[in-house]
Regions:
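Short, small-residue-biased leader/transition segments that mark boundaries at the very start
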Residues: 1-7
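Acidic/glycine-rich phosphate/pyrophosphate-binding loops and surrounding catalytic core
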Residues: 11-18, 46
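Glycine-rich phosphate/ribose-binding loops and adjacent secondary-structure elements
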Residues: 21, 26-147
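C-terminal extensions of enzymes
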Residues: 148-218
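Secreted/extracellular small peptides and ectodomain modules produced from precursors
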Residues: 4, 112, 151-154
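Residue-level signal for well-ordered alpha-helical scaffold segments within enzymatic catalytic domains
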Residues: 13, 54, 79-82, 166, ...
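Surface-exposed helix-capping loop/turn segments at secondary-structure junctions
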Residues: 15-27, 88, 194-206
Length: 218
């Protein structure tokens, strides 16, 4: 072996070198440590301990939500979280459903990314505070109610379930656009309500009320 420095260390050295160059375009870009190890808790913990030594600005848990049971994902988060620096943001990659987000916050995760709001919307699957719905279902043919009676997004204020059902059946592009708008609004509202409940010390109540409910299909 020509060098004892592993790829993990080289990444930080190279990142620091590039940021030190006078013509670097954006010195605000950050290098984060991404925890891996599949569903093996011992490998996950070992890896988290190693990347924590690099003193990076943030840490992520990667390689989950790729087909393993949800409970296994939660077990991995619980195993890794104690070894993540307490003063750095924790990022769970590629997650997830509204229930996944609530349960992961309860386990110490700070933020997320996921295509689910947009991807599901394109297939007529929309999120509401009562659970998820599929607007292609025949029962919405003459449903004049909004997507979600509790939602105040522009779509819910102006359009009915029946109208969006018609748009999907007619294969109109507008159906997907309106549905994506609603789902993104829902996710923004969800995360805002989570933050508010954490600030007021009521997250436990919020979790008890919505974690299971939002996982249901109605």
């Amino acid at each position: 072996v020509g060098s004892e420095m592993c790829i993990r260390d080289r990444c930080k050295v190279e990142h620091d070198r590039l940021n030190a160059l006078p013509d670097t375009v954006n010195r605000q870009q950050m290098l984060w440590g991404i925890n891996q190890g599949a569903t093996f808790k011992d490998l996950r913990i070992w890896h988290m301990k190693e990347i924590a030594k690099l003193d990076l600005p943030g840490y992520a848990i990667g390689g989950l939500a790729v087909g393993e049971p949800t409970e296994v994902m939660y077990e991995i988060i619980e195993a890794v979280e104690p070894y993540m620096p307490k003063d750095r943001p924790r990022y769970l990659m590629g997650v997830g459903t509204p229930s996944n987000i609530i349960e992961s916050v309860a386990r110490g995760v700070d933020f997320f990314d996921c295509v689910m709001p947009a991807r599901n919307a394109r297939h007529a699957k929309l999120f509401t505070w009562q659970g998820s719905i599929n607007l292609k279902n025949a029962k919405y043919t003459r449903d004049d109610g909004p997507i979600d009676p509790q939602c105040v997004c522009p779509v819910c204020r102006r359009y009915s379930r029946a109208y969006l059902h018609h748009l999907f059946k007619a294969e109109e592009m507008l159906a997907m656009r309106l549905s994506v708008m609603h789902n993104l609004y829902f996710y923004n509202t969800l995360t805002r309500r989570i933050r508010d409940s954490l600030d007021t010390g009521t997250f436990g109540d919020f979790r008890a009320e919505y974690s299971q409910k939002l996982a249901e299909k109605i």
